[in-house]
Structures are given as structure tokens and as C-alpha cells.
Amino acid sequence: VLVDLPGTAVRREDIEAWEAETGVTISAGDALFLRTGRDVGQSGGYHPSLIPFFKERDIALLGSDVPQEGGQVEGVQAPIHVFTLVSLGVHLFDNLGLEELAQTANELGRWEFMFMASPHAVPHGAGAALNPIAVF
């Protein structure tokens, strides 16, 4: 699911308003992608207050065109990374190129698609470059 909300730290009310507007509901097992508009000079990210929402909706993967962080929690460096990876077991895809995906989604009027990714095998690695594919 692509949520296209550039230029803001996205909070629960933003996602719920987006769901009402698009008719799309983020559900268990979804891969959730946020386009912040980084590549066109805008910025934003997931606000840490969304962490309970991620748990409630039981998402499987979280991605964005930025390193995810749209706000801070006192005493916690990179709260989205810490809480989603460690506490929820959610996979993270940072710094994705989402402009073409957003353009296609807008043209089709569709925000849901099949997502696949093929990472490079890195023995004992904790992260790797990958080839993401969205099929509408």
C-alpha cells in the first residue's frame, strides 16, 4: 500500500483520513510505503506516535523514501527503527525511490499492489541493496 503524503510527519489521523479518502484500509500483512516527497524537495516521515497503529494493523513491512523517522522520542535514537524492528519484528526499507510508483498509482487511481523484493545475499549481513518490484 502506498500512502502519498509528502512534506509532513505523518500521524495516525493523517493515515486514517487518507484511508477514508481513498477507500483503502491498511490490513494485517500489508507492506506500507510512505512517499514523503524527498526527491522533489519535500520531507517528512512516520511520526513515532504511529507505532501502536502499526501493531494494531499488524503490518509486515514499512518503507519510505526517507530513513523513516518523522519525529523523535526523548532518550530514544531513531524510534521508528527501534520500536518497529525490535519490538514488532517489522522489516524496514529505507530511502526507496518512490516517485515513479507514486506517479503510476496516481495515474491508475490505485494504491494497492503486489510487492516483491530481491535482496543481494550478504552472508551475516543485517542489510543489503535490493531490487523492489510493484505489480499493479
Segments the model singles out, each with a brief description of its role:
Residues 1-136:
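Active-/binding-site microenvironments in catalytic and ligand-binding cores
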